[in-house]
Each structure stands twice: as structure tokens, then as C-alpha cells.
Curated annotation (Swiss-Prot):
UniProt EC number: 2.1.2.1
Lineage of source species: Bacteria, Pseudomonadati, Pseudomonadota, Gammaproteobacteria, Pseudomonadales
Residues that coordinate or bind (6S)-5,6,7,8-tetrahydrofolate: 116, 120-122
Pathway(s) served: One-carbon metabolism; tetrahydrofolate interconversion; Amino-acid biosynthesis; glycine biosynthesis; glycine from L-serine: step 1/1
A GO cellular component entry from the record: cytosol
Record SUPFAM superfamilies: PLP-dependent transferases
Alphabetized UniProt keyword annotations: Amino-acid biosynthesis, Cytoplasm, One-carbon metabolism, Pyridoxal phosphate, Transferase
Record-annotated site: Plays an important role in substrate specificity: 224
Function: Catalyzes the reversible interconversion of serine and glycine with tetrahydrofolate (THF) serving as the one-carbon carrier. This reaction serves as the major source of one-carbon groups required for the biosynthesis of purines, thymidylate, methionine, and other important biomolecules. Also exhibits THF-independent aldolase activity toward beta-hydroxyamino acids, producing glycine and aldehydes, via a retro-aldol mechanism.
Quaternary structure annotation from Swiss-Prot or TrEMBL: Homodimer.
Protein name: Serine hydroxymethyltransferase 1
HAMAP family assigned to the protein according to its UniProt record, in alphabetical order: SHMT
One Pfam match: SHMT
């Protein structure tokens, strides 16, 4: 029996979401479109299999096939990133971060991460998150004028507080991160270095963004975003930490791994090993830079003045529109992105003074620099006259046409 016949309510909602994805331009930096092959693996009967433990060391029978699948995922990830150790079992990037913390830290230990207010992530020490509740968290930020990472401040805080772990990585930072400089201060004070590369993983795999492999003690990531795989987590590390990380993921922190998701991760890693993936990631950066340049020429302020990766922030204060209102305005024209705090944002987190723009999904659709320049101009047109309903409707129609020209999936 088909899903349509058995559960028409869910089938209709899936169809509605499919239609939304096909008819909206996706600019959320943390979203992407997986391939049909990744969808097939994730939607497979592997979802039926329980496999607590690790290949060759399971607590259930019947795991010979899924052992091969997990080993293949590990092998491909090691080849992709050139690392010594890989764990593909984390269910998410946040859980990968938690696992690393639990592996080598004790409650109350000091950590140093990037401030959420300056582009960091909740799991890097925010007070509302487990990382800020169970550990004594200190945060570094950006230089006021350049809006780039303040390495001097980070080093001063490290020497003052002597954290047991320093975290490099961000969720809304558009510039290259100097991982060797983090390593140097960690060595000076005797701290672990963890790099959260969730946003940059695909770029790193393709060699278009500096790699922390061989520099950091621990590297965590999601497997979606720029890596263009299923939603899930990943841990890379030096071989000396293999035993403690394996034990922390299972049995300390998780139970059975999601074998259908691990299979989908393996497919995504295989895709990322191909030459086309490398070309794709360079196009992602080119498209982001093109959009940032166009918006700058249109009079909007790009935080830090540009981008070295797949995303950037727009400061909307001069436009007299909040990030929340801009998000809603753009969505009414079928352009999807997210409100985002700018450095030292005077607005509340639910309102914000900025928006974040990312190009992974547009690039997956086949958009090049010309199309991305047009989209940037459409965004500027909307922000300049947010109350012009006729303009909004005209832009919505143009967006719909672009979506038709560049479908996400070739539906039959």
C-alpha cells in the first residue's frame, strides 16, 4: 500500500514540503539538497536494524552487513579528510560536540569558545546550552573595526583563564579561521583544541578552505550543510583518542546508531570524493562572493566586508528593517533565509538586526554567478521598498521562474 493510500495526511504534507522546496530559493547557510542516491540510502530498510556497539563488537546478532556499511563510511571519511580516526555514529553535530566534551572534560572544567553574539554556536559555551551549564565557559569575539576574529583577545583570555579546551569554529563567521594560531596557544597553555567545522566541512573536504586535520586534537562536524549529506554528526580525531571517543559515543552517550543514516553518510562521502564535488565547492564560494559584492554595490553593509566561504551576514540597520521582518518579507517572495544577529546586535535574538545568506543550496540547484547576482539584486530590491506589494509580487513571479529553470529534483 502506498503512503498516499495509508496515510494521506502525511503524504499531503510531504508533497507540500516538496513543492515548497521546488518553488523557493533556499539561502539558509546550513541547508542543502541531498542527492537522490542519499535519499535512497536514508529511506532504505536499514532503518530496521539495531546495531549497538561498533563493527565486529556489536551487542546484537545479524550485524555483518551493517558492519560493512559502517566500515565503508569510516574508510571514505578518513580518505576524504585525511585523518587518523573517524566516528560516524553521532546523531547530530551538537551530539558530536557533547561527546568530545564528555570524553576529556569534567563538569566545571574551563572552556573557551567564540561568543554566540559574534557568530559562535550554542554548543561552544552559551549559557543556555549544556556547554555553558556544565562547564565554566569563557568567550572570545571579533575585532570591532574589521569584524574579524580577535586572535589577540582569544590568546589573552586563554592565558588568563587557562581553559582545558579551546574551541575554534562558528555558525555565522564568513572569514578563514587561523587554526595554526589556535594550536599555538593551546600548546602554550596545555589545552585541547577542538575545531567545529560543521559549516565548512564540504569546503575543507574539497580543499578550498584550510583544513584543521593534523592541527586540532578533535574535529566535529555535521554531515549536511556544505558536505551535502544526510542530517547527522561526525567526529575526526588523532588516533590516540580513538578508544575514549568510541566509549563516550557508546555506551556513555548514545545507544544504537542509525544505520540508514550512516549508509547515507557513506554515499555522501563517496560523492564528496569525486572531482565534481571540488568544483561545486569552489562555485559555492564564488557565488557567495558575487552576492556579497552585488549587495555591497547596492548600498547594503556586509559584515566584515565580504566572505571567504559559503555565507555572509547583512547588517540591515541602515535599511530600517529588522532581521525578523526581512526574513518574512523575503519569504513572501519565495526567498528563504534566516534572521541573524550581527556583532554586538542591539536587537533581541528573536528580532536581530541582520540576515544570514548562504549559497550551498542555490549552487546545488545549478545557479552560477550570473543567477546569484540576479538573486542578490532581487533581495536589494525587496529591502529597499518592503511595503511595495506590486514589487514583491513581481519578484515572487521572477523567483518562481528561476525555480522552474533550475529544479531541485527531476520529478517523473
Amino acid at each position: 500500500m502506498s503512503l498516499q493510500n495509508f496515510d494521506p495526511a502525511i503524504a499531503r504534507l510531504i508533497d507540500r514540503e516538496r513543492n515548497r522546496q521546488e518553488t523557493h530559493l533556499e539561502l539558509i547557510a546550513s541547508e542543502n539538497y541531498v542527492s537522490e542516491e542519499v535519499l535512497q540510502a536514508q529511506g532504505s530498510l536499514l532503518t530496521n536494524k539495531y546495531a549497538e556497539g561498533y563493527p565486529g563488537r556489536r551487542y546484537y546478532g545479524g550485524c555483518k552487513v551493517v558492519d560493512e556499511i559502517e566500515n565503508l563510511a569510516i574508510e571514505r571519511a578518513r580518505k576524504l579528510f585525511g585523518c587518523e580516526y573517524v566516528n560516524v555514529q553521532p546523531h547530530s553535530g551538537s551530539q558530536a560536540n557533547q561527546a568530545v566534551f564528555l570524553a576529556v572534560l569534567e563538569p566545571g572544567d574551563r572552556i573557551l569558545g567564540m561568543s554566540l553574539a559574534h557568530g559562535g554556536h550554542l554548543t561552544h559555551g552559551a549559557s543556555v546550552n549544556f556547554s555553558g551549564k556544565f562547564f565554566q565557559a569563557f568567550t572570545y569575539g571579533l575585532e570591532k573595526d574589521s569584524e574579524t576574529l580577535d586572535y589577540d583577545q582569544m590568546e589573552d583570555l586563554a592565558r588568563e583563564h587557562r581553559p582545558k579546551m579551546i574551541i575554534a569554529g562558528a555558525s555565522a563567521y564568513s572569514r578563514v579561521i587561523d587554526f595554526p594560531r589556535f594550536r599555538k596557544i593551546c600548546d602554550e597553555i596545555g589545552a585541547y583544541l577542538m575545531v567545529d567545522m560543521a559549516h565548512y566541512a564540504g569546503l575543507i573536504a574539497a580543499g578550498v578552505y584550510p583544513s584543521p586535520v593534523g592541527i586540532a586534537d578533535f574535529i566535529t562536524s555535521t554531515t549536511h550543510k556544505t558536505l551535502r549529506g544526510p542530517r547527522g554528526g561526525l567526529i575526526l580525531a588523532k588516533a590516540e583518542y580513538a578508544a575514549v571517543l568510541d566509549k563516550t559515543i557508546f555506551p556513555v552517550y548514545q545507544g544504537g546508531p542509525l544505520m540508514h543514516v550512516i549508509a547515507a553518510k557513506a554515499v555522501a562521502f563517496n560523492e564528496a570524493l569525486g572531482d565534481e564535488f571540488k568544483h561545486y565547492q569552489q562555485r559555492v564560494i564564488n557565488n557567495a562572493r558575487t552576492m556579497a559584492d552585488v549587495l555591497t554595490r547596492r548600498g547594503l553593509r556586509v559584515v566584515s566586508g565580504g566572505t571567504d566561504c559559503h555565507m555572509f551576514l547583512l547588517d540591515l540597520r541602515a535599511m530600517n528593517i529588522t532581521g525578523k521582518d526581512a526574513e518574512a518579507l523575503l519569504e513572501s517572495a519565495h526567498i528563504t533565509l534566516n534572521k541573524n544577529a550581527i556583532p554586538d546586535d542591539p536587537q533581541k535574538p528573536a528580532i536581530t538586526s541582520g540576515i544570514r545568506i548562504g549559497t550551498p543550496a542555490l549552487t546545488t540547484r545549478g545557479f552560477g554567478e550570473a543567477e546569484c547576482a540576479e538573486v542578490a539584486n532581487l533581495i536589494a530590491d525587496l529591502l529597499e521598498q518592503p511595503d511595495n506589494t506590486a514589487r514583491v509580487e513581481n519578484i515572487r513571479r521572477r523567483v518562481m521562474h528561476l525555480c522552474e529553470c533550475f529544479p531541485v529534483y527531476l520529478l517523473t
